[in-house]
Amino acid sequence: MFALTAAAAALASPFAHVQTTQSQLALCNPCVQLGGQGLNYLVNEILNAGVIGGCGKLCHGLKAGVERTGCDILCGAVGIEAFVKALNKTDLDPIYFCEEVHACPAGRDDAAGSVDGNAVSPATGPAGTTFAMQVDFSVINATGVGEIRIAVKGPGPSVGQSFLNTGFTPGHYATNVTLATKDDPSAQPPVQWLPGTYEYEFEVCQGECGSKHPHSKVFGSTKGTFQIA
């Protein structure tokens, strides 16, 4: 439903403008791909079945794709004991989990930035329109692994998504997120984009937005609206 696209001086990829060497990031991408749902499954699996069978058995229950691949790579690299210990103390926060197993470098405590504004195009359109929403932000002191989060609410469905990044050097950035407002009557529950005003909100964070864990920071947020006619 959402897609992240690049704008001038924006994320050319999720790993643009990183503050660390590629060797430090070798495990970071597969680790964060586990996500909160993947971590939740692994915690429940450990509670219900233990870790007999090691990494292979633990990771096999994840759906094939980036989650299982990330689990296999990371658990194999750090070992089952360190993997399970981190799972039990990180509260399903994928970024903090990846920092705890040293797959991602810890965020900088002096990281600083601000959210400068937003824009949307078009401002009004019928259901089926793809709206492009832009967030502008500045980085004052270099940041570590974090996310840009967007949430949309209105008379139709409430939707949201987070986009991970591995940090930014000081500078000014603009990142676009596109939202396709296409009805889907086959979905459960059905998706219908009703006419009215929709509010969107961006947050730019180091670590997971809203996390209380060390190194996590919210640099700011910004809101805007668009209309479905």
Residue ranges and their predicted role:
Residues 206-229:
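Short beta-strand elements
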Residues 15-110:
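Long, contiguous interaction/targeting segments characteristic
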Residues 129, 144-146, 166-205, 213-215:
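A glycine-anchored, Pro-Gly-centered beta-turn/N-cap motif
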Residues 143-153:
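Beta-strand-rich binding/interaction modules
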Residues 120-144:
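Contiguous beta-strand segments within globular domains
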Residues 1-16:
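Fungal secretory targeting signals
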Residues 103-126:
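Short, compositionally biased P/S/T/A/G/V-rich stretches that sit at domain boundaries
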Residues 156-164:
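Surface-exposed loop/edge segments in extracytoplasmic proteins
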